[in-house]
Amino acid sequence: MHELSLCMSAADIIREQAEQHGIARVTDVWLEVGALADVEESALHFCFDIACRDTVAQGCTLHIDVIPAQAWCWDCSREAEIMQHAGCCPHCGSERLRITEGDDLRVKSLEGE
């Protein structure tokens, strides 16, 4: 379950950002999850709660935005938006795609007091 390691990394980033900005308690966190990140949303919520235990983010509300992946098509030389690994280029139908974005998880923003 790689969700736990992703959430541990996110919790580290949240702690660092809260410290830098003088936030004593994080109330909300927004994560951007790429469509190809291979994470289960319910597992992400569960692991996030574990990763944030005993931190400034404990008990915060987690918001997850799934973002489409971007790929470069080798055959028609165009960018394409895809939602799965086995995607085809919507422009030419080619399967020769190179993923350029959307296979990661990012801390988009956080709110606190």
Curated annotation (Swiss-Prot):
One GO biological process term: protein modification process
Pfam families the UniProt entry points to: HypA
Keywords assigned: Metal-binding, Nickel, Zinc
Annotated Zn(2+) binding sites: 73, 76, 89, 92
UniProt keyword Calcium, yes or no: no
Presence of keyword Zinc: yes
Matching InterPro entries: HybF, Hydgase_Ni_incorp_HypA/HybF_CS, HypA/HybF
Binding residues for Ni(2+): 2-3
GO-annotated molecular function: nickel cation binding; zinc ion binding
Record's function text: Involved in the maturation of [NiFe] hydrogenases. Required for nickel insertion into the metal center of the hydrogenase.
PANTHER family, sorted: HYDROGENASE MATURATION FACTOR HYBF (PTHR34535:SF4), HYDROGENASE MATURATION FACTOR HYPA (PTHR34535)
Protein family membership: Belongs to the HypA/HybF family. HybF subfamily.
HAMAP family found in the cross-reference section: HybF_subfam (MF_02099), HypA_HybF (MF_00213)
Name this polypeptide is given: Hydrogenase maturation factor HybF
